[in-house]
Amino acid sequence: MPRRYGMVEAFAVASGKGGTGKTTSTLALGMALAERYDVTVIDADTGMANLLFHTGLDDADVTLHDLLVAERDVPVAEAVYDRFGMSVVPCGTSLAAFEAADPGRLRDVVAELAADADVLLLDSPAALGSKSAVLPVVLADRVVVVLQPTVPSLSDGLKVQEYARSYGTETAGVLFNRVRPDEDVEAISEQAARYFGGTTLASVPESDAVRAARRAGEPLLAHAPRDPAADAFHEAASNLDVRSGDAADVADRFRSAVVPDRP
């Protein structure tokens, strides 16, 4: 996909707690958006990395962890892999690497990646309990909040939005995921419309194909492109209003972003 020269927007894909299917959603949105944009997906969940298992990168030689350790001085390009029409930056799973990583270095990494992308998707940690967890939300232009259609999930998502807004990051939209047939999405959607800044992007049904895709080491849209869940993710990508930002300005903002100690 030829990129729109010099234009970029960064989205954090976030949720209040684990289990919402955030990584599945990040990659599905990425593949759908890659039909129109040059997309880079970054696994910014440095403590509980998961994206590498969804993209067949279990044995990746270089990951985001390597870029976040100053002593290693690894070029950013070495951690970027072409997968499923996207550029993917996985994160490793080593506890030692996580402890050695400096989350603040993520600013420079994202700034460099912004030069070669129209859309950056930051797969963010599910909880906001540390500096490494909150930084992706702080860096992003806007956040996509992934929820399940329950009141507790809605409450958790609102906490993410409240924190994001405290750093000037607005909500791009809400994505309801893993929706079962017996769940009343409409009622929860009405509440979400009242409390969240962005629109409801789509309602994605629970699907066995998602688990099968994970076992195969593939994103859902590659493994089962005609599954109803895949269709819903395409709908979400279509409803996501991607805005134009000057790549140089965005990179400067990333590099100068305030690094919070914790929420």
Task: Put a short name on every predicted segment.
Residues 15, 44-115, 215, 219:
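P-loop/Walker-type NTP enzyme "switch/lid" segment
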Residues 16, 148-149, 172-184, 203-210:
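G-domain G4 guanine-recognition motif of GTPases
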